[in-house]
């Protein structure tokens, strides 16, 4: 399913019930991108695991609580931990965390926070004794470049230059120390 926020669909669970009847016959797996952590549930995950598991994508938005508060995204580490724990407990070994880069007031510490958040998710996976020697985890960081949009609180905030975004992308790559973490980011010049 593809949307800006899949878990906001008012009848998502009913839709998944219908797709779960159809998908196995067609050898199709279900992937739910752009999930909000505040409405991800055991019921929802059970409906996605009836067919071959693919990855789950969660919007973490920013690498630090300070920056999430600046952009008014009410995602906390506790929600990230709860959501990823639920995914791992239900057999998922791959999660993608979506972040924005170039947000207003962003510092290099916020960029390092992206890598630290991903590492904490890797550590969370291995904190379960069942996963200690089993199959590995893959945490993908996906960073989009912040582009100010009209009619939003940040519409008049200048966008970071391509050079600044490239420096932040390089710093993020240097901050990631684990082979269990993959980093994808948008081309700063086309953003």
Protein language model annotation of sequence segments:
Residues 1-96, 101-140:
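Conserved SAM/AdoMet-binding glycine-rich loop
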Residues 88, 111-191:
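Auxiliary Fe-S-binding modules of radical SAM enzymes
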């Amino acid at each position: 399913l593809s949307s800006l926020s899949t878990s906001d669909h008012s009848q998502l669970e009913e839709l998944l019930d219908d797709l779960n009847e159809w998908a196995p016959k067609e050898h199709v797996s279900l992937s739910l991108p752009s999930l909000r952590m505040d409405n991800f549930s055991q019921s929802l995950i059970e409906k996605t695991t009836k067919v071959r598991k693919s990855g789950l994508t969660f919007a973490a938005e920013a690498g630090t609580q300070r920056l999430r508060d600046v952009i008014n995204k009410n995602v906390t580490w506790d929600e990230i931990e709860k959501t990823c724990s639920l995914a791992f407990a239900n057999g998922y070994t791959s999660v993608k965390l979506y972040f924005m880069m170039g947000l207003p007031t962003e510092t290099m510490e916020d960029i390092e926070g992206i890598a630290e958040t991903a590492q904490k998710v890797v550590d969370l996976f291995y904190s379960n004794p069942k996963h200690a020697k089993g199959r590995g985890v893959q945490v993908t960081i996906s960073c989009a470049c912040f582009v100010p949009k009209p009619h939003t609180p940040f519409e008049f905030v200048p966008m970071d230059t391509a050079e600044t975004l490239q420096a932040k992308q390089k710093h993020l790559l240097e901050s990631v120390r684990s082979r269990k973490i993959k980093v994808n980011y948008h081309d700063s010049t086309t953003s």
